[in-house]
């Protein structure tokens, strides 16, 4: 082997090591802070799944999670339940109402008189609002609540219309259906979606999914599991009863071990904890 070939092999080996090291996301004090994702918006300070709740998150630099349902005439709306009973001044199923009929619903007074006449927003309106904050690096998690074989393409079309497809992450139980994932991927290969894992056994299956770029865990994963997710080039999004409440110890664990995003009802409190963590570094 001549000197030139030897030199090239050394350089190549150095580059391989550098790439492998770069793929290992740091943990502990060097771990970047996770993104805050407000559950249905700033849920403790404004009515869930409304523009007021989402705007509050955007102003604070938080991401948010939103739910997707459809009206009788096919419009995509932001609503968690299948009925309007809990979060408006009327009763009934959303699928029995047209988009026009939803306009008069009061989706804010149930929470506080200050939010009287907040409406059930259309997904088009929500995406437009996100687009109005182009400098935000937050994550906007889309939880598809229906499975009608057309919703995935419709969502991608709206996201691309507003130029925010790369800022959305598709999550939830519906996305566990392989056909839903395939339709999202067919709509646009740049779609970011997460496979759900409720425990360590499911994490193995979720990591093996070739179409997903994130793992959506609903338990507190071990440091080794978090490292494994990152080693495979994916990111980890945590939700569920380990982080949804005001759970400072679990939040601190996620911060220390490099979880990428935390979905919580207590976005403001988590924000304060992240600021303290950043200041202490």
Which residues does each PLM region occupy?
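Acidic (Asp/Glu)-rich catalytic clusters
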Residues: 28-30, 127-135, 156-163, 181-188, ...
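Long, acidic (Asp/Glu-rich), low-complexity accessory segments flanking structured domains
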Residues: 23-44, 115-118
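Catalytic domains of carbohydrate-active enzymes, especially glycoside hydrolases
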Residues: 53-70, 209-215
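Metal-dependent phosphodiesterase/phospholipase catalytic core, i.e.
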Residues: 80-190
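Conserved, mostly hydrophobic/aromatic
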Residues: 39, 57, 67, 102, ...
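C-terminal active-site rim and adjoining tail of enzyme catalytic domains
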Residues: 192-281
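Hydrophobic faces of well-ordered beta-strands that scaffold small-molecule active sites
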Residues: 36-38, 64-66, 140-142, 168-172, ...
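Bacterial N-terminal signal peptides
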Residues: 7-17
């Amino acid at each position: 082997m001549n000197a030139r070939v030897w030199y090239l092999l050394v350089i190549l080996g150095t580059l391989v090591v550098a790439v492998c090291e770069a793929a290992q996301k740091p943990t502990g004090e060097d771990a970047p802070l996770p993104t805050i994702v407000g559950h249905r918006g700033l849920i403790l300070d404004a009515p869930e799944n409304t523009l007021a709740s989402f705007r509050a998150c955007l102003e604070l630099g938080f991401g948010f999670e939103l739910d997707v349902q459809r009206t009788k005439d096919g419009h995509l709306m932001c609503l968690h339940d299948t009925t309007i009973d809990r979060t408006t001044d009327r009763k009934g199923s959303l699928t029995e109402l047209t988009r026009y009929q939803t306009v008069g619903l009061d989706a804010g007074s149930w929470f506080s008189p200050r939010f009287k006449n907040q409406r059930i927003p259309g997904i088009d309106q929500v995406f437009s609002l996100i687009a109005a904050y182009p400098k935000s690096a937050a994550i906007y998690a889309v939880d598809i609540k229906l499975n009608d074989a057309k919703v995935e393409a419709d969502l991608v079309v709206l996201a691309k219309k507003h130029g925010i497809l790369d800022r959305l992450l598709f999550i939830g139980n519906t996305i566990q259906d392989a056909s839903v994932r395939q339709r999202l991927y067919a709509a646009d290969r740049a779609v970011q979606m997460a496979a759900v894992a409720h425990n360590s056994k499911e994490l193995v299956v979720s990591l093996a999914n070739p179409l997903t770029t994130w793992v959506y865990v609903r338990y507190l994963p071990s440091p080794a599991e978090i490292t494994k997710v990152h080693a495979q080039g994916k990111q980890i999004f945590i939700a569920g009863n380990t982080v949804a409440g005001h759970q400072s110890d679990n939040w601190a664990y996620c911060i220390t071990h490099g979880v990428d995003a935390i979905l919580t009802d207590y976005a403001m409190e988590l924000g304060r904890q992240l600021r303290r963590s950043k200041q202490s570094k």
